[in-house]
Amino acid sequence: MTTPADDFTQPETPAITLPAFLELMNNDLQNEWTHLKFYLYHASAITGLDVAEYREFFSDAAKGEMDHVQQFLDRLYGLNYANPTQTSHSFSVFSRADDALTHAIELEMVVAENYVKRLQQLEQLAGAHPVTARYLTVFYEDQLKDSYEDAERMRRIMANDLREIMRNTRHDPTKFLAK
């Protein structure tokens, strides 16, 4: 005899496969290409009194993203993924530093959230591929740390501007806060 509680049990979520995870990882690589191009573009596009400082900031950020792209490529090739992406998503362009930084914070927080999902998916992958899953867990923890800290650094750069933006806002303030 079944009880009413039996009718409400959730079906088990099937564990993710390694090929499916590598597809998601390739999508993450595309996001990293987007960040690289965004920062490199804005190193030259920003105008204003502090242009030299922002050029240096965005150039350094682009170098960091280039490292991320290389790390994702190395992992994908190391796991025999046949054709890692060479493309990025399109991105918004800005001439004002505060607009570019605001958007960059959003970009970094989106990937940070994706990396949290990947870490959860790697828990599912661990049963079938324990060593690979553990290695990729360390990899994604490092990526999460970098993206979160990049967003945090930009929030600090913009501390006063960000408060004003959020007050008058055309931006959703929750995009700037850690979840």
Task: Locate predicted features.
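Iron-associated oxidoreductase/ferritin-like identity signal
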Residues: 1-179
